[in-house]
Each structure stands twice: as C-alpha cells, then as structure tokens.
C-alpha cells in the first residue's frame, strides 16, 4: 500500500519578505512550504518574469510578478518593500536559492533597515548540492561565486585564495570551464578537483580528478549545462604557489609557447601540456 503524498499545508499570510528557493532542475524539488507561501503571495519579485511565470504555471499558481534584478532602481525596491509591509512578498531567482550568486542583496538589506521581517523558505542550492556529492572535504568550504572572465583577473582571484584551508566552490559556464581548469592546474597541479553539472537533471554528472585531467576530458567532450567547480583544500605540506603566469610571460618574451612551457615546466614541475595551453592563452590575450 503506497503512502499518499502530503497536501500543501494551510498557511496564514503574514506580511514580510520571503526569500524562497526554487528547483535547480528537477521540478519535484519544490517544498510544500514554498508552494503554500507562493499561493498566498501578494507579489513575487523575480529575475525574469518569463522564467518564474512558467515555473508558477507548472504548479498551478497565479501570482502578480515584478521584475527585480541587481539593475533595478532604488524606487522599485522601495515599492516592493512597501508591499511587504502590507502582505507577503516573495523573492525568487530563476533557479535555486536567491542571493547565492543571484540578485537580492540590496533588497534584503533595505528591507531589514526598514523594519520589514525577512524570512527564509529554504530549498535547492547548486553549490551545496555539488559539495554533497563531490567527495571533497565538506567540513569547511568557501563559496566564491563565478570566476572572472578575464584571464588576469581569474588568475589573481585564484592566487588570492591559495592559502584558504577549505574546499573552494565556484560557479562556471560551460564555454569557460576548460580555461578555468587550465588556470587551476597551473597553480595547484596536485589538488583534487570536481566538476558537477546538470545537477538534479537527467544527465547529472560529477567528475573528479586533477584540473589538468579534467581540462583534457572537457576539451575533448565539451560540457553543457550549469556547472559547479570545486577545488579541494591544500595539503598541509603544499609549497607556496609560484606565479606561473609571471614565469610564462617572462619566458614568452624570449621564446615561443612550446619552448616557454618547457622552461617553466622544468622550473616548477608543472605538467608541460598545462603550461603550453596557458602560454597560448597568455600570448593571445
């Protein structure tokens, strides 16, 4: 005898701002509490009204939608906060938990300053889901959002995190994944890395290995979908990171990418193929 699915609980609408997580892929991951709050919402503030509109339609929910992203002017946030004084206003992102590399920080800060109650309606989060299945140390982790697009900025950000004794968690796009893996391999060739993609969807995958090995795999098999990139913490005996970009630039001033990669490989012990790929990126920058 199969158990009946629980019904959506009754909820007495209470004024305030509700930060509500939505599914990151599998629509079955919405919570009963989230559905109850959405059904009673006076207003749903969202990144994209089309995306949220489709989501609500799937659950049979009708709601008034207000586009609100990081570019929204102060007067739009002020109107949303005024509504939250009168009834329940929900903030959602396109997928996952709002404010985790998504808009909403300014709205929450201003709502709290205005004395509006802010409540979390928890649910899916890609960063936490990836950490849970990657097999990397999870007792301490640092979520750092998206890696910068520019090579120099990306390298500087990674170097700044070199001494963090925790698993590093990033969001990344499919087109930039291989470049980011090359950058990580140049700094931390021995660290364990995980690439989690299409989380909760049909083709969910979590692949682990060195950054160089993963870069080679995804160069041959270009990925699709949303990606979470995780880097394990440094080993206790890990030597200070050398600035390989500086070494490569100096070598490139005197030689071509192949020879420059060979020279730096001898000096650092980093895989020549990884350095060669990075040398080509620097030469084309």
Segments from the language model and where they lie:
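A contiguous loop/helix-start segment that scaffolds small-molecule binding in enzyme catalytic cores
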Residues: 2, 6, 14, 88, ...
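Glycine-rich, flexible N-terminal cofactor/catalytic loop recognition
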Residues: 2-71
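Generic beta-sheet signal
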Residues: 16-20, 85-93, 141, 166-170, ...
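Short active-site oxyanion
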Residues: 38-44, 115-119, 167-168
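General beta-strand structural signal in soluble alpha/beta enzymes
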Residues: 46, 93, 118-123, 170, ...
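Conserved helicase motor
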Residues: 66-74, 147-150
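Short phosphate-binding loop-to-helix
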Residues: 70-83, 103
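Class I SAM-dependent methyltransferase SAM-binding "motif I" and its flanking Rossmann-like core
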Residues: 106-164
């Amino acid at each position: 005898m199969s158990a009946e699915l629980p019904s959506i609980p009754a909820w007495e609408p209470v004024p305030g701002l509700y930060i509500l997580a939505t599914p990151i892929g599998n629509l079955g991951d919405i919570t009963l509490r989230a559905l109850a709050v959405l059904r009673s919402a006076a207003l749903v503030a969202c990144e994209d009204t089309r995306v949220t509109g489709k989501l609500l339609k799937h659950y049979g929910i009708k709601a008034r939608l207000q586009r609100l992203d990081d570019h929204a002017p102060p007067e739009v946030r002020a109107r949303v906060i005024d509504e939250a004084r009168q009834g329940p206003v929900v903030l959602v992102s396109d997928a996952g938990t709002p404010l985790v590399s998504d808009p909403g920080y300014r709205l929450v800060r201003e709502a709290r300053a205005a004395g509006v109650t802010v409540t979390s309606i928890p649910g899916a989060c890609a960063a936490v889901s990836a950490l849970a299945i990657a097999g990397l140390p999870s007792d301490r982790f640092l979520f750092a959002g998206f890696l910068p697009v520019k090579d120099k900025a990306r390298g500087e950000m990674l170097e700044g995190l070199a001494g963090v004794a925790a698993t590093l968690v990033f969001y990344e796009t499919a087109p930039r994944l291989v470049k980011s893996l090359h950058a990580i391999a140049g700094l931390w060739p021995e660290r364990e890395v995980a690439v989690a993609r299409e989380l909760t969807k049909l083709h969910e995958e979590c692949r682990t290995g060195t950054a160089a090995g993963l870069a080679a795999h995804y160069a041959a098999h270009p990925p699709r979908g949303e990606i979470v990139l995780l880097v394990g913490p440094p080993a206790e005996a890990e030597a200070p990171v050398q600035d390989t970009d500086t070494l490569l630039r100096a070598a490139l001033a005197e030689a071509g990418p192949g020879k420059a990669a060979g020279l730096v490989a001898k000096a650092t012990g980093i895989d020549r193929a990884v350095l060669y790929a990075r040398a080509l990126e620097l030469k084309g920058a």
